[in-house]
Amino acid sequence: MGGLYSPTTYGEAQAATEAAWAHGIRYFDTAPYYGYTRSERRLGALLCDRERDSYIISTKAGRLMVPDESVSAEENGWVQPLPFRPTFDYTYDAILKSFEDSQQRLGIVKLDILYIHDIGPYTHGDRHEHYWRQLTAGGGFRALLELRRSGRVTAIGLGVNEAGVVQDAMQEADIDVVMLAGRYTLLEQMSLPLLEKCVRAGTGIVIAGPFNSGILVGNNKFDYEDAPSDVVQRVQALKAVCDEFDVPLPAAALHFPMAHPAVVSCVTGARNAQ
């Protein structure tokens, strides 16, 4: 919906949303970062006329979107993003502002889930400690807890690409749910110890990126980059096994994470109705 790797028209986003609804899907996820606010704006427009208690919606905080006309036609994989510059900020005030900005873009007062987006060394490298201090000493977690306590958000958690930072966060705050992208899939299960911990803690896991950025549905992307040869070979081996049992590889990839008791949902990142 935000235009990752190629443009997505409003008509395509509308058709995808309507097809999902027709097939019984009622959980929709977005983020300010996706399309540099485009995804939130589109999803809000497509859902705002439906009964609010008929669906679940989640978004994320951790980047403020600052108006900037110098944003190029393609940035960070987003094609034709809107003119807003993503700026990391996990402090108390920034989390609240991000939430309020999302409310307006979505046209929704109460959110079902608010995730802290992309905290961790995978995203921030040697700047991770700086941003982690913003979440802890800087009050980011406190803002999340206040939003939940006030009823403006039903559940809080993390939306990340790595397992280690989730375990750190579970020691800092009582989080309800974690969106984990690409780390418990048919191709990669390095986060299995985290999932076992979440079962014990009663923390739900939403699996994102079940196709590892597309490599499991036939394109050459893995972890948002061109897939290395060893990954391609592993996928070919998985496909051979699936072919033996007459099961499409994408179907196996989609069903695999749902078998774990920690996993409460799976988001696929569909761009069109097909």
PLM region spans:
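Surface-exposed, active-site-proximal loop segments in enzymatic domains
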Residues: 67-87, 122-129
